Curated annotation (Swiss-Prot):
Residues 152-224 form the HTH crp-type domain. This is cAMP-activated global transcriptional regulator CRP. The gene is crp. Induction: Constitutively expressed; slightly induced on shifting to starvation media. It comes from Haemophilus influenzae (strain ATCC 51907 / DSM 11121 / KW20 / Rd). Transmembrane segments: none annotated.
Length: 224
């Protein structure tokens, strides 16, 4: 287990990089968007509704999730500043939303209709590269997640999830690593296990001096 938190450094850090490396083309794109501010826990996308709009996170973070027929929620990912979402309908005209998207924190979101975005592509095809580059990285991350589900035990999945979260923009620098805020239930929804199991694994990681947990606050030692 001691290697699981140190060997996971290849996971997603793109949202941090993109948030601090704004490109002039991206700034041009944002001038054509409608900008909105949302409080935490606002629902931006409902699964099953028509897909007509592309979103871009300027500040804050959002949670992407799905629900089974019984209403049980599974957290698919968190997206932070510099990330697009709601793009599937852009390539599959007439499709319905397949997931729920809610703000995790207070957010500033840029929104643009698919029709307008396609017009921008005609004016400057480079704007499409921002989106396709992210989609390529997400596909890699999804492949990694599937591999983890197949080969890592639940303790390994939780350890990797904590390291992933420690690399998100809203994670706070701590003298011993990075500090995150997340509930046991949310972790369970991300890795596919019960809240009680998460609690036991968190305690085990603490005993191994890999993390420190107090309520929703978790310090991941050695993460930067």
């Amino acid at each position: 287990m001691s290697n699981e938190l140190t060997e996971i450094d290849e996971v997603v850090t793109s949202s941090q990089e993109e948030a601090t490396q704004r490109d002039p083309v991206l700034d041009w794109f944002l001038t054509h968007c409608h900008l909105h501010k949302y409080p935490a826990k606002s629902t931006l996308i409902h699964a099953g509704e028509d897909a007509t709009t592309l979103y871009y996170v300027i500040k804050g973070s959002v949670m992407v999730s799905s629900k089974d027929d019984e209403g049980k929620e599974m957290i698919l990912t968190y997206l932070g500043a510099g990330q697009f979402f709601g793009e599937a309908g852009l390539f599959d005209e007439g499709s319905k939303r397949s997931a729920w998207v809610k703000t995790k924190t207070t957010c500033e979101i840029a929104e643009i209709s698919y029709k307008k975005y396609r017009q921008l592509i005609q004016a400057n095809p480079e704007i499409l590269m921002f989106l396709t580059a992210q989609l390529a990285r997400r596909l890699q991350n999804t492949s990694r997640q599937v591999t983890n589900l197949a080969f890592l035990d639940v303790a390994g999945r939780i350890a990797q999830t904590l390291m992933n979260l420690a690399k998100q923009p809203e994670a706070m620098t701590h003298p011993d690593g990075m500090q995150i805020k997340i509930t046991r239930q949310e972790i369970g929804q991300m890795v596919g296990c019960s809240r009680e199991t998460v609690g036991r694994i968190i305690k085990m990681l603490e005993d191994q001096n890999l993390i420190h947990a107090h309520g929703k606050t978790i310090v991941v030692y050695g993460a930067r």
